[in-house]
UniProtKB/Swiss-Prot annotation:
Domain of life: Bacteria
Protein name: Ribosomal RNA large subunit methyltransferase H
UniProt source species: Exiguobacterium sibiricum (strain DSM 17290 / CCUG 55495 / CIP 109462 / JCM 13490 / 255-15)
Similarity field: Belongs to the RNA methyltransferase RlmH family.
Keyword match Glycosyltransferase: no
Catalytic activities: pseudouridine(1915) in 23S rRNA + S-adenosyl-L-methionine = N(3)-methylpseudouridine(1915) in 23S rRNA + S-adenosyl-L-homocysteine + H(+)
Gene3D superfamilies associated with the record: 3.40.1280.10
Enzyme Commission code(s) on record: 2.1.1.177
Subcellular location: Cytoplasm
Gene Ontology CC: one annotated term: cytoplasm
C-alpha cells in the first residue's frame, strides 16, 4: 500500500520531525509512505472571511495538485468522523482488500481545508473535538497508521 501524507506548511520543530521519522521508519515494514509538504499561503494575522477563504483556496489548489485520480483521500478535519483505533485499522485493511492501494491523508493549515479539498475527499477523519496544531497532527496520524498495521497483523503494541 502507498500512503501519502499531505500537509500545509513546513515542519520546523525538531521533536516532531524526530517522532514522525521514527514512525515512518517503523511503517517501512508494512507500507510505502511518502510525506508531501505544500507551502502555506502567507497572510497577515487578522483576516476577513473573504481573505481566509482565499488563503484556503490557494492552499487547497496546492494540495489537489498532489493527489492523483486513483487515490482514496482522507481529509483530517475537526468535524470529521471519529473512529476507534480498531475501526481505523479495519477500514485500512478493507481498502487494501478491495484494491485501494493508494491512500492520501490531508492535513490543512491553521485555517483548515478548502471546500474543494473536502469535496475531493472520499472520507473525513477526526482524532478529537479538540483543536491541535496541524504539525502535531502529522505525528499523531503516523502513530495511528502504525498502530493500525500492528492491530491488523495481531502484533503486540502498547495499549
Amino acid at each position: 500500500m502507498q500512503i501519502t501524507i499531505i500537509t500545509v506548511g513546513k515542519l520546523k520543530e525538531k521533536y516532531l520531525k524526530q517522532g514522525i521519522a521514527e514512525y515512518t521508519k517503523r511503517l517501512g515494514a508494512y507500507c510505502s509512505i511518502q510525506e508531501i509538504e505544500v507551502p502555506d499561503e502567507k497572510a497577515p494575522e487578522q483576516l476577513s472571511d473573504a481573505e481566509m477563504q482565499q488563503v484556503k483556496k490557494k492552499e487547497g489548489e496546492r494540495i489537489l495538485a498532489k493527489i492523483g485520480p486513483d487515490v482514496h483521500v482522507y481529509a483530517l478535519a475537526i468535524e470529521g468522523k471519529q473512529r476507534t483505533s480498531e475501526q481505523f485499522a479495519t477500514e485500512l485493511d478493507r481498502l487494501a482488500t478491495y484494491g485501494k492501494s493508494k491512500i492520501a491523508f490531508v492535513i490543512g493549515g491553521s485555517l483548515g481545508l478548502a471546500p474543494e479539498v473536502m469535496q475531493r475527499a472520499n472520507d473525513t477523519i477526526s482524532f478529537s473535538k479538540m483543536t491541535f496544531p496541524h504539525q502535531l497532527m502529522k505525528m499523531i496520524l503516523c502513530e495511528q497508521i502504525y498502530r493500525a498495521y500492528r492491530i491488523n497483523r495481531n502484533e503486540p503494541y502498547h495499549k
